[in-house]
Amino acid sequence: TDCGGKTCSEAQVCKDGKCVCVIGQCRKYCPNGFKKDENGCTFPCTCA
């Protein structure tokens, strides 16, 4: 997603021209935690 000249990852949304982490809740259990992007944002319901 184009966001103020930057491209947000799938784990981010554009808010006020900035890429921010998606805040979501998932009831899925991941023994190694959830997958994160290069910015430290968690991918929704995606195990690492």
UniProtKB/Swiss-Prot annotation:
Where does it localize?
A: Secreted
Record-annotated disulphide pairs: C3-C14, C8-C19, C21-C41, C26-C45, C30-C47
Which GO MF terms are attached to this record?
serine-type endopeptidase inhibitor activity
Residue ranges annotated for the Antistasin-like domain, each copy included: 19-47
What exactly does this protein do?
Inhibits plasma and tissue kallikrein, and trypsin. May be involved in leech hematophagia.
Give the record's family classification: Belongs to the protease inhibitor I15 (antistasin) family.
State the protein's name. Answer: Piguamerin
Which source organism? Hirudo nipponia (Korean blood-sucking leech)
The lineage is: Eukaryota, Metazoa, Spiralia, Lophotrochozoa, Annelida
